[in-house]
Regions:
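N-terminal secretory signal peptides that target proteins for export/translocation
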Residues: 1-27
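Bacterial N-terminal signal peptides
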Residues: 29-43
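C-terminal cap of metal-dependent C-N hydrolases
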Residues: 56-59, 395, 407-442
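Histidine-rich, glycine-flanked metal-binding segment
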Residues: 58, 62-102
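Metal-associated gating/positioning segment near the N- to mid-region
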Residues: 99-171
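Polyanionic/metal-chelating signatures
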Residues: 155-286
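Glycine-enriched alpha-helix->loop->beta-strand junction motifs that scaffold or abut catalytic
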Residues: 279-285, 302-309, 344-346
Length: 442
């Protein structure tokens, strides 16, 4: 008969239990170590994603100034703005005491980053199918890659967003684009493309056409060709089942469907009148670039809610450099911005500057603030002036859901200045784009 050694069984059970407990203890403590490491690693990841700029005077543009305020950024977006903001312990903190903190500036009209040879297509005078983003060369404008793409000369003036246009040497040059002035990749840099259709009235296209021995050379012929193009696009829209694609007509359809606006460069009274007539006839959204004589139609522009992008007024005061073909870029009188604003017209300033082989190499990022300061000196209210180079500019470009003011959820494009933004003595000390520090004053 088999005898059972109960004492041995009890001893074995106790031994197995101790071993099991030891194993569980080891697993438990190892888990704690792993959890601790994961927590530390997660906190490390958050550092740099959370930014707090505290102690400075914050100008949110969309609201009142906040003295001794805090601007909180999380994952590249504005998280909070105020005077009693709790700063997370894992945040990168910059003390801006004695500084001004405001949204990054927007230059609403440039040819920056485009080689002059790529600005104007001379094969034909009307080319709506062309996209300037294809000629955009950030490595040439922003410094050789690979690596960060930075427009240092623009960043030094606090400019974080620009509109780039095809050249104004043809009647209809093509589709413009909106880009940031610093990014890690090209795709990250682009905000919108296409963003508008660029058209030029005045004598400049005619001069180029004479040189190329082609038509049109007169304004009446140029406008006639524009109207023919619009009418052809309307007919194309009514026959969308046509199996033959037409890239130029597809591009024009974006205008007729009001998916993008037309930006018409018009300075003389007659050209501004023509621009408004075209917009009325073909029912597209209109932005006038240049607008040197826009106060001639100030009431009508206000009634039609047409925005004006004024050219630079500061260049003659500061630079001894002569701009070729000045007649094509007439100096806007210093009080025009104030008069347009008073009439209820949305106004922004554009540098109309070139990045590679500029016609006016003295025009860099600082000029946008200088133009704004001059407008203040001639009667435009300071808050309206600051808005014209931030939120109003963003509204004109239809990107105010992303940039232009410190509102929760918008891109954290931020500049820190060492004084009054409208003082010529003030310098931009730091620039952040999407919450990332991209420029510091040397």
């Amino acid at each position: 008969m088999l005898r059972v050694n109960w004492r041995m069984i009890v001893w074995l059970n106790k031994t197995n239990r101790k071993q099991s407990i030891n194993k569980l203890s080891n697993i438990f403590f190892r888990s704690l170590i792993i959890i601790g490491c994961i927590t530390q690693y997660s906190e490390a990841l958050l550092i740099g994603q959370t930014l707090a700029i505290k102690g400075g005077t914050i100008i949110p543009i969309s609201g009142l100034r906040v003295n001794n305020g805090t601007l909180l950024v999380e994952n590249g977006k504005i998280k909070a703005v105020g005077s009693n903001i709790k700063i997370p312990r894992n945040a990168d903190v910059f003390d801006a005491t004695g500084k001004i903190v405001m949204p990054g500036l927007i230059d609403v009209m440039t040819y920056y980053g485009i080689d002059p040879k790529d600005l104007n297509e001379t094969i034909k005078p009307i080319t709506p199918e062309l996209r300037i983003i294809e000629s955009y060369y950030p490595f040439g404008a922003f410094g050789e890659g690979p690596g960060e793409l930075k427009a240092t000369d623009l960043l030094s003036g606090g400019i974080t967003t620009i509109y780039i246009a095809p050249g104004d040497g043809t009647i209809l040059g093509g589709q413009g684009a909106i880009v940031k002035t610093a990014a890690s990749t090209f795709d990250e840099m682009v905000i919108r493309a296409p963003a508008a259709m660029d058209i030029t009235l005045g004598s400049k296209p005619g001069k180029l056409n004479r040189k190329e021995n082609r038509t049109p050379v007169t304004k009446m012929a140029a406008v006639s060709q524009l109207r023919e193009t619009f009418i052809k696009a309307q007919e194309y829209q009514t026959n969308k089942d046509n199996p033959v694609r037409d890239l130029s007509m597809e591009a024009m359809s974006l205008l007729l469907e009001r998916k993008i606006p037309a930006r018409i460069q018009a300075n003389g009274p007659g050209d501004i009148r023509t621009a408004m007539n075209l917009a009325d006839e073909f029912n597209f959204d209109l932005i006038i670039d240049g607008g040197a004589s826009s106060d001639t139609y100030i009431d009508e522009l206000a009634d039609k809610s047409i925005s004006i992008v004024l050219g630079p007024v500061s260049h003659p005061y500061i630079s001894g450099e002569e701009i070729p073909n000045l007649s094509e870029y007439p100096t806007v009188d210093e009080g025009l911005a104030g008069r347009l604003h008073k009439a209820g017209i949305k106004v922004a300033f554009g540098s109309f500057s070139y990045g590679l082989g500029s016609l006016a190499k003295g025009i860099t990022g600082k000029w946008l603030l200088i133009d704004a300061a001059i407008a203040t000196g001639y009667g435009m209210p300071e808050d309206a002036v600051l808005r014209s180079i931030t939120l109003s500019a963003a509204e004109i470009l239809d990107i105010d859901d992303r940039v232009g003011s410190f509102e929760i959820g918008k891109d954290a494009d931020i500049i820190v200045l060492d004084g009054d933004p409208l003082s010529i003595k003030t310098w931009v000390e730091r620039v952040y784009i999407s919450g990332k520090l991209v420029h510091t004053k040397e």
